[in-house]
């Protein structure tokens, strides 16, 4: 029987996908305050994000990413396209994926959930709000990872 073992915060890894370096730096600062031992990897495009996930899934040299944070509005491949691609890939579809955007449009939010996003965060937000969001996300996904794997549920 295979189970997912509990992940310690020092082993928890987040992939951040954002074409805006300033926003990525804000997320990094907020994450340092929210969960200082969590590792953050940043790529600047959705295509790079897909490639990163496929490579890490194939080679496991860094270990699997535990959570993906993806901006919705990016050039070339949008956040919508990224979510569809990841959730449509049998090897990647279980990857927890949180979309964030300046759009609070109900249609955008609904579309993200219909494509398979696990959560949606609207910005702008204060640094304090960002820290609280990241604390909650990391705590939630650490709890999920500590649940018994599918083999135990049969």
Go through each PLM region and give its residues.
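Short, glycine/charged-rich "phosphate-handling" switch motifs in NTP-dependent
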Residues: 118
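Non-catalytic signal-transmission and effector/linker regions of two-component phosphorelay proteins
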Residues: 1-15, 21-39, 47, 54, ...
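A Lys-centered signature of the CheY-like receiver
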Residues: 123
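Conserved phosphotransfer cores of two-component systems
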Residues: 35, 57-63, 87-94, 115
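Active-site residues of response regulator receiver
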Residues: 71, 101
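Negatively charged, flexible loop motifs adjacent to catalytic sites
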Residues: 103-107
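Receiver (REC) domain active-site loop signature in two-component systems and cognate sites
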Residues: 74
């Amino acid at each position: 029987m295979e189970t997912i073992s509990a992940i310690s915060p020092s082993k928890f890894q987040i992939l951040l996908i954002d074409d805006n370096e300033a926003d990525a730096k804000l997320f990094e600062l907020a994450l340092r305050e929210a969960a200082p031992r969590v590792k953050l990897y940043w790529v600047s495009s959705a295509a790079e994000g897909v490639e990163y996930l496929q490579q890490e899934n194939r080679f496991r040299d860094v270990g699997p990413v535990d959570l993906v944070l993806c901006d919705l509005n990016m050039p070339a491949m949008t956040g919508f396209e990224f979510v569809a691609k990841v959730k449509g890939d049998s090897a990647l579809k279980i990857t927890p994926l949180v979309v964030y955007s300046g759009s609070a449009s109900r249609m955008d939010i609904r579309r993200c959930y219909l494509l398979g996003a696990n959560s949606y965060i609207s910005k702008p937000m204060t640094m304090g709000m960002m820290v609280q969001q990241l604390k909650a996300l990391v705590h939630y996904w650490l709890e999920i990872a500590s649940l018994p794997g599918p083999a135990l549920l049969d």
